[in-house]
Amino acid sequence: MTNPVSALSDMSVSNLNGNQSSRQLQILLANETVRVGKRLKIDVVPFGGIEADIWADAGQKNVYKELDRILAEKTGGGDWRPSMAQDVLKGRPTEIMQMNGFVSSQGKSIGINTPINDVVTKMIMDIDKRLIKPSFTNIENIMSFS
């Protein structure tokens, strides 16, 4: 889930994992994504070194804390940016509709709310259109409403 969060914030992955708000956003995105996938009977493979069922249970306080701890431990792993953030930096269109936009549309089709994927998709589309700029403020704005 680092792809859109890095693109939104213009932060490297190691910096994302060092920030509580960006870790929270990654966890919420992963939770919605796995819940949609499981409802669609998709075999969601582990990602980020973590089993899909754990991401699906991120709404439980103890599970959320463990996920947050795991992500925080990945801080300092290098100053790299995933493909979507590189697209933003180079002014290329992103793959947001094939990723988070897909989760949002599939969620709607099966009655699962995906408010975090919805807003992230909209904001990345606005970045693609150059209506807003990538900034950590984007993450803060999303988290203030969640």
Regions found by a protein language model. Name each.
Residues 1-17, 21-36:
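Active-site-proximal catalytic alpha-helix in oxidoreductases
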Residues 25-146:
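NAD(P)-dependent Rossmann-like dehydrogenase/reductase catalytic/cofactor-binding core
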